[in-house]
């Protein structure tokens, strides 16, 4: 690729951002140095790109100040169609799930159970600095209500970041939420009513099962594979038998399998959803933790018919405590905003402003590179330890990102009993039982590898392995 083509590509991308309103008239675009570092290109290449944009009348240089947006052409935001839908299987695991979450927070417990990143992998100091600045310099606004759809500078930063997932959106299309589960629950509330059927991957995120139970929904579980994602064949069979109102899934780094749907199968999935008029709710909370960024796009990137409601959050990358997520609801935007206005309004004003400031300062990408490297090393270490210390016949997933590991033990091992015995040793795990409304994953566990690999972690894995070996030798224990 020549420099000429490269600078044209950079200019074209920035022009698109300006047309979509990511950068407003009179607003400064990234400096030459910042853009050069961000794209890993020379200063000369960026200067050529900016000169090209000046020729188009899109930006203008100000002496000793930088480049600013000069004019903004009309926004072009196509918003096509969508779907709807219904079927059986009530959710039951709520009390066990609550127990697992409570135990994972106890002092002195090694928390393999909850998928929460260790504090070493959170930019605590940087977030604290931004929170202090927000409360010091913007206190009247920071302590007022922030109504739906949320803090506009934050929505602009999210719109910029969505480009990495292959999704081009206007800031106006972004709705800030109280984390990803809040986005999921609002999606399901506008798509379904009590008694309706939704489809989900199996195994699936236990929070979705809790949410379905809360909303009075029935769940049909569609088998999923760590390498190829949800079974399209099984989904089609289900759609032929029942009226499915919505499909909730994760196309990139599913929880608990850590699987990613290849792009061709993502397109097939969208065609199938169109054929059967199924609305899709995409949970992309782990998407920014893929080890090879840009290799696989979000499902929303291929959504030409506005069939996907996209949901995500900063809980797995910045901090679970900030409770800032977002969604792109397409034709359901007005309905979602009305629902949000009369329930939660929007996420906390202070944290929205602090996260926006943190993203604007440019440290987020550096932070993501750091934690991706750490999680890749952690997963390798935990996988090796499980292989060495768990019973013969144990299998595990090979995630291409994130920090969760799905472990399948020999069939005799009841992991609910393993969970009980592990707690007696000060170790929390997530038994496979909670990831399904069936009992087919009773021999599986999910391990949180977002914990630094050290002697304590090694001892915890060895202890789990010994307990699993012990259960292998005992008569099978029936599930309660």
Regions found by a protein language model. Name each.
Residues 127, 304-373:
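Conserved core segment of the aminotransferase class I/II
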Residues 60-61, 169, 429:
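Short beta-strand "wing" residues that participate in macromolecule-binding interfaces
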Residues 138-276, 287-303, 309, 375, ...:
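Conserved core of the PLP fold type I
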Residues 1-134, 337, 341-348, 359, ...:
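N-terminal basic, amphipathic alpha-helical segments
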Residues 283:
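Glycine-centered flexible beta-alpha turn that most often forms the glycine-rich phosphate-binding loop
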Residues 369-394:
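Conserved PLP-dependent catalytic core of the aminotransferase class-I/II
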